[in-house]
């Protein structure tokens, strides 16, 4: 049975790490007033909370990206019956974009998000921010800023629940199921 177990990660510390890293990176690279996009669902929760800790770095409303139609596994896992469209209340063309995800694992979610972003236009740059990063990349995608690196066994999965309160849990996957 796959019973989620709470993970003792200090969510506030993860957000402080992520916000500090993003503020520093944007200042070092002189990227003023970037737009922020959260990947539905967990990345949106992270981005919403992160916006409050970024020293007015982002002035546009938060963009929401639903990558359901861009996933490379929907033929295997099926489509969610009520897919909401993406909402980008700004043009991505020639903009510096901060793309936010909750957990970076295989890289496939980020690949799908990048494909969708480029369908809206060609950004000047994309900075990837992840609250948690774990090993297991299947694609050559790395986060630019990370709140925490988490070491998990191959049969473990981390999940963010929320939005209030945000909490991580680890689910142990039985390989015989």
Swiss-Prot record:
One of its GO terms (molecular function) is uracil phosphoribosyltransferase activity. A motif (PRPP-binding) lies at residues 97-109. Pfam families: Pribosyltran (PF00156). InterPro entries: PRibTrfase_dom (IPR000836), PRTase-like (IPR029057), PyrR (IPR023050), PyrR_bifunctional (IPR050137). CDD domains: PRTases_typeI (cd06223). It catalyses: UMP + diphosphate = 5-phospho-alpha-D-ribose 1-diphosphate + uracil. One of its GO terms (biological process) is regulation of DNA-templated transcription. The keyword Glycosyltransferase applies. Its EC number is 2.4.2.9. Keywords: Glycosyltransferase, Transcription, Transcription regulation, Transferase. It is an enzyme of class 2 (transferase). The keyword Transcription regulation applies. PANTHER family: BIFUNCTIONAL PROTEIN PYRR. Belongs to the purine/pyrimidine phosphoribosyltransferase family. PyrR subfamily. Regulates the transcription of the pyrimidine nucleotide (pyr) operon in response to exogenous pyrimidines. Also displays a weak uracil phosphoribosyltransferase activity which is not physiologically significant. This is Bifunctional protein PyrR. It comes from Nitrosococcus oceani (strain ATCC 19707 / BCRC 17464 / JCM 30415 / NCIMB 11848 / C-107). The lineage of its organism: Bacteria, Pseudomonadati, Pseudomonadota, Gammaproteobacteria, Chromatiales. The gene is pyrR.
């Amino acid at each position: 049975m796959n019973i989620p177990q709470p993970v003792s990660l200090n969510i506030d510390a993860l957000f402080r790490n992520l916000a500090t890293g993003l503020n520093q990176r944007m200042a070092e690279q002189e990227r003023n007033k970037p737009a922020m996009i959260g990947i539905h669902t967990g990345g949106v929760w992270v981005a919403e909370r992160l916006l409050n800790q970024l020293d007015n770095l982002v002035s546009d409303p938060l963009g929401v990206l639903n990558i359901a139609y861009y996933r490379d596994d929907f033929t295997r896992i099926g489509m969610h019956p009520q897919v909401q469209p993406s909402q980008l209340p700004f043009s991505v063309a020639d903009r510096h974009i901060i793309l936010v995800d909750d957990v970076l694992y295989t890289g496939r979610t980020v690949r799908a998000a990048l494909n969708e972003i480029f369908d809206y236009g060609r950004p000047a740059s994309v900075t990837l921010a992840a609250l948690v990063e774990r090993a297991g990349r299947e694609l050559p995608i790395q986060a630019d800023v990370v709140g925490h690196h988490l070491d998990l066994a191959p049969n473990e999965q981390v999940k963010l629940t929320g939005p209030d309160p945000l909490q991580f849990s680890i689910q142990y996957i039985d390989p015989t199921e």
